[in-house]
């Protein structure tokens, strides 16, 4: 059967199924480019490692750029992957629970598949040849050292004889949130250290000094959910270094009311903390915490708070600048689901910790600033050169007076909260189909400034690439979603993300596996200057011939075209290879439609962020008018749908897009409307000349309502009937008669009744009817 004839017969059904929903206006939060799992693989932008058994059960990921290795901790195994290759030679070491641990775990009521295994949750660098690894050990945590060799060697070995108890260094459960970092040969962890998951603490172990832990007082930690831990120096004095913990707490209502609320915190301890001599023995004597606020200001002073901390990324600066903390938050409200990204300067965090302490007289009282005398040395400070005074040396926290230790025990909370830069989030996402789980940031130098590119991992296996424009007269940050990348084939939550600026690569981890993803692929945006400029990707610029990687030190400076802030190709791309686009926009596709029938004109812009507009030039008119839509003429996301075509709809249609003030033509159609009377006459004449048959009598019984029959037949359950109806009544006959679907009026995608040159074919068809081959007999 002629493909054009089949497309004509089944067009109406596909229209009803696929284009019946009106198109909403473009949203600034819609990704400008969406790339599927297949797209990423076919363009070599990503590579996937699923392990030898098809699924990793990944728990932790450690990127070691010194050794050019990526280390993975999973269920009962560890892996080493080389960064300079597409995972061709992975190394695996099995690490099963100790004998009897799994049996005991099952006996205690835990799940043998999802809990009673050794889930590796800690991978930290110990020295130049070894990593410290800790696993859940079937609810009996264990730790050991892993030999990884020197730089250039691809070695991965586990010494089973060195396995030791990991309690306090690794949680019992594979799903329990926790954070860890390795500083000076010691492991700092924030976790719940008991079997039942109730004993929350911050723990230090593994070095020559005695282990240190949080006091059991509930005022320190209330059901914490640890997210991240890192050593952050306050100044050049190494004795003043601190380890910062980022976490959320569920605490009693701060105003003394009933119920509990979730609050995000930043806490810190001194690296040289040794505990107290008589008070807080073997306990933290420098622990302080402050609230992290991420909220959107509203009318009347009301604020919408994002209180659940999801992930934290530290953006280390160049010399002379302050460290910036990017934090991803979510709402805890049952009313709506929202996410926000707030940015904090470390200098602002330091100011809060140097400010007033919080105090209240009782559980039913509100918090206020402490107004009494603060002892010396100031509670929470590290013993260092800054605290030493003549005649009163404090070389260790054990030398601190008891009143200092008692004060820090009673007042661990700071009164002032830490507020984000500019007082509001740089990015807010609400009513998403997926949850945001991970965040990493890359600071990129572009032609018109420096931009922070934010990569957000979701719980559906995709990564959003976003920039937030600030300043330049903007009262609020402008969100620009550059790409949505479907990294994994099936939906799976992204639980780990690491970025290599040196390799311009993002490493994405999920329970399914690990993906290596290039940060950019500029040629994907298109082959024209306007398309490259409209992408607004700081990584990419038009170099005069193609959309290519922007390099600040490139010698082709005068040829580069890039406008991240405004995305205006009208200025940037003047005379830069737009002739090809103009030639394409001048092409006119001829489309035929039948009066009172449905017809569809397809227009698919490259950018979902562009506003689509349709213009009509009627026969005899010199100017064009914008198409007015109503119940009969509907503009959808795929094009323009005429539900019931009229003779007045004939004319030249132009589909244009408008994006950042730049308009361009996508496609043009010349729509010709065939009168219903003319088509009815054709069917009536054919039915009289045909041999009698059941299908022939059906066609001639109601020649004026044939299109209504097709509409009634459309539907998934009736597709075989549509096929048979088209085949026997119309499609095969038309395909065999005089090549009436051949010629210059060819069927375009989604166009009905293309190629019916009725005026030219009518006479020849009538003269040749007596020589026509019967429909049910093949020609010889």
UniProtKB/Swiss-Prot annotation:
<comment type="function">
    <text>Has chemorepulsive activities for sympathetic axons. Ligand of NRP2.</text>
</comment>
<protein>
    <recommendedName>
        <fullName>Semaphorin-3G</fullName>
    </recommendedName>
</protein>
<feature type="glycosylation site" description="N-linked (GlcNAc...) asparagine">
    <location>
        <position position="44"/>
    </location>
</feature>
<feature type="signal peptide">
    <location>
        <begin position="1"/>
        <end position="22"/>
    </location>
</feature>
<dbReference type="InterPro" id="IPR036352">
    <property type="entry name" value="Semap_dom_sf"/>
</dbReference>
<feature type="disulfide bond">
    <location>
        <begin position="603"/>
        <end position="655"/>
    </location>
</feature>
<feature type="domain" description="Ig-like C2-type">
    <location>
        <begin position="569"/>
        <end position="671"/>
    </location>
</feature>
<feature type="glycosylation site" description="N-linked (GlcNAc...) asparagine">
    <location>
        <position position="127"/>
    </location>
</feature>
<feature type="disulfide bond">
    <location>
        <begin position="294"/>
        <end position="342"/>
    </location>
</feature>
<dbReference type="InterPro" id="IPR001627">
    <property type="entry name" value="Semap_dom"/>
</dbReference>
<dbReference type="InterPro" id="IPR013151">
    <property type="entry name" value="Immunoglobulin_dom"/>
</dbReference>
<feature type="glycosylation site" description="N-linked (GlcNAc...) asparagine">
    <location>
        <position position="652"/>
    </location>
</feature>
<feature type="disulfide bond">
    <location>
        <begin position="522"/>
        <end position="540"/>
    </location>
</feature>
<keyword id="KW-1015">Disulfide bond</keyword>
<keyword id="KW-0393">Immunoglobulin domain</keyword>
<feature type="disulfide bond">
    <location>
        <begin position="270"/>
        <end position="382"/>
    </location>
</feature>
<feature type="disulfide bond">
    <location>
        <begin position="105"/>
        <end position="116"/>
    </location>
</feature>
<dbReference type="GO" id="GO:0030517">
    <property type="term" value="P:negative regulation of axon extension"/>
</dbReference>
<dbReference type="InterPro" id="IPR016201">
    <property type="entry name" value="PSI"/>
</dbReference>
<dbReference type="InterPro" id="IPR015943">
    <property type="entry name" value="WD40/YVTN_repeat-like_dom_sf"/>
</dbReference>
<keyword id="KW-0964">Secreted</keyword>
<dbReference type="GO" id="GO:0030215">
    <property type="term" value="F:semaphorin receptor binding"/>
</dbReference>
<dbReference type="InterPro" id="IPR036179">
    <property type="entry name" value="Ig-like_dom_sf"/>
</dbReference>
<keyword id="KW-0732">Signal</keyword>
<dbReference type="InterPro" id="IPR007110">
    <property type="entry name" value="Ig-like_dom"/>
</dbReference>
<feature type="disulfide bond">
    <location>
        <begin position="134"/>
        <end position="143"/>
    </location>
</feature>
<dbReference type="Pfam" id="PF00047">
    <property type="entry name" value="ig"/>
</dbReference>
<comment type="similarity">
    <text>Belongs to the semaphorin family.</text>
</comment>
<dbReference type="GO" id="GO:0005576">
    <property type="term" value="C:extracellular region"/>
</dbReference>
<dbReference type="InterPro" id="IPR027231">
    <property type="entry name" value="Semaphorin"/>
</dbReference>
<dbReference type="Pfam" id="PF01403">
    <property type="entry name" value="Sema"/>
</dbReference>
<keyword id="KW-0325">Glycoprotein</keyword>
<dbReference type="GO" id="GO:0005102">
    <property type="term" value="F:signaling receptor binding"/>
</dbReference>
<feature type="domain" description="Sema">
    <location>
        <begin position="32"/>
        <end position="519"/>
    </location>
</feature>
<dbReference type="InterPro" id="IPR013783">
    <property type="entry name" value="Ig-like_fold"/>
</dbReference>
């Amino acid at each position: 059967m002629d493909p054009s004839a089949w497309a004509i017969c089944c067009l109406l059904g596909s229209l009803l199924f696929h284009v019946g929903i009106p198109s909403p206006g473009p949203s600034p939060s819609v990704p400008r480019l969406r790339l599927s799992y297949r797209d990423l693989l076919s363009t070599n932008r990503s590579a996937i490692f699923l392990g030898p058994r098809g699924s990793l059960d990944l728990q932790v990921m450690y990127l070691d750029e010194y050794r050019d290795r990526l280390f993975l901790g999973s269920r009962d195994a560890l892996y080493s992957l080389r960064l300079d290759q597409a995972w061709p030679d992975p190394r695996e070491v099995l690490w099963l629970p100790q004998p009897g641990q799994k049996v005991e775990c099952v006996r205690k009521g835990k799940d043998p598949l999802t809990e009673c295994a050794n889930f590796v949750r800690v991978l930290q660098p110990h020295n130049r040849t070894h990593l410290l690894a800790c696993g859940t050990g079937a609810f009996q945590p264990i730790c050991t050292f892993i030999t990884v060799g020197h730089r250039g060697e691809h070695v991965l070995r586990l010494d089973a004889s060195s396995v030791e108890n990991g309690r306090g260094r690794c949680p019992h459960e594979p799903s329990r949130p926790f954070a860890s970092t390795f500083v000076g040969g010691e492991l700092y962890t924030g976790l719940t250290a008991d079997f039942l998951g109730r004993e929350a603490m911050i723990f230090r172990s593994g070095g020559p000094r005695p282990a240190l832990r949080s006091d059991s007082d509930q005022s320190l930690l209330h059901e914490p959910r640890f997210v991240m831990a890192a050593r952050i120096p306050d100044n050049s004095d190494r004795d003043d270094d601190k380890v910062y913990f980022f976490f959320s707490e569920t605490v009693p209502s701060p105003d003394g009311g009933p119920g509990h609320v979730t609050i995000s915190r930043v806490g810190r301890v001194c690296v040289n903390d040794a505990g107290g001599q008589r008070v807080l023995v073997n306990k933290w004597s420098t622990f302080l915490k402050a609230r992290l606020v991420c909220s959107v200001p509203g009318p009347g002073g009301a604020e919408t708070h994002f209180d659940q901390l999801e992930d934290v990324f530290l953006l280390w600066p160049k010399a002379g600048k302050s460290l910036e903390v990017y934090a991803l938050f979510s709402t805890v409200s049952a009313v709506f689901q929202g996410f926000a990204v707030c940015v904090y300067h470390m200098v602002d965090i330091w100011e809060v910790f140097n400010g007033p302490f919080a105090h209240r007289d009782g559980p039913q009282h509100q918090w206020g600033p402490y107004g009494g005398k603060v002892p010396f040395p100031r509670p929470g400070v590290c013993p260092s050169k800054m605290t030493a005074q003549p005649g009163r040396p404090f070389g260790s926290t054990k030398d601190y007076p008891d009143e200092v230790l008692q004060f820090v025990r009673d007042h661990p909370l700071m009164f002032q909260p830490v507020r984000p830069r500019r007082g509001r989030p740089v990015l807010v996402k609400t009513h998403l189909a997926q949850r945001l789980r991970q965040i990493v940031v890359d600071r990129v130098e572009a032609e018109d400034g420096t931009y922070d590119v934010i990569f957000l991992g979701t719980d559906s296996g995709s990564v959003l690439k976003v920039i937030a424009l600030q300043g330049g007269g903007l009262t609020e940050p402008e969100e620009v979603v550059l790409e949505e990348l479907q990294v994994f084939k099936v939906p799976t939550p992204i639980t780990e993300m690491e970025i290599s600026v040196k390799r311009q690569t993002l490493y994405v981890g999920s329970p399914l596996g690990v993906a290596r993803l290039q940060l950019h692929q500029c040629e994907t945006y298109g082959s024209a200057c306007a398309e490259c400029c409209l992408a607004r990707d700081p990584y990419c610029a038009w170099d005069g011939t193609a959309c290519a990687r922007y390099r600040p030190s490139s010698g082709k400076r005068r040829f580069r075209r890039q406008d991240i802030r405004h995305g205006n190709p009208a200025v940037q791309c003047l005379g830069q290879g737009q002739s090809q686009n103009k030639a394409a926009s001048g092409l006119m596709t001829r489309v035929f439609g039948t009066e009172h029938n449905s017809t569809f004109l397809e227009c698919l812009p490259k950018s979902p962020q562009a506003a689509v507009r349709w213009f009509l030039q009627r026969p005899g008119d010199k100017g064009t008018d914008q198409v007015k839509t109503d119940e009969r003429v509907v503009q959808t996301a795929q094009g323009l749908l005429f539900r019931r075509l009229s003779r007045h709809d004939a004319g030249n249609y132009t589909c244009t897009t408008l994006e950042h003030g730049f308009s361009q033509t996508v496609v043009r159609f010349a729509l010709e409307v065939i009168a219903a009377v003319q088509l009815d006459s054709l069917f009536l004449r054919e039915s009289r000349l045909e041999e009698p048959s059941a299908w022939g009598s059906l066609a001639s019984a109601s020649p004026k309502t044939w299109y209504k029959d097709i509409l009634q037949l459309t539907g998934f359950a009736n597709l075989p009937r549509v096929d048979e109806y088209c085949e026997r009544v119309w499609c095969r006959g038309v395909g065999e008669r005089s090549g009436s679907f051949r010629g210059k009026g060819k069927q375009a995608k989604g166009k009905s009744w293309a190629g019916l040159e009725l005026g030219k074919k009518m006479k020849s068809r009538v003269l040749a009817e007596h020589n026509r081959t019967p429909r049910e007999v093949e020609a010889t």
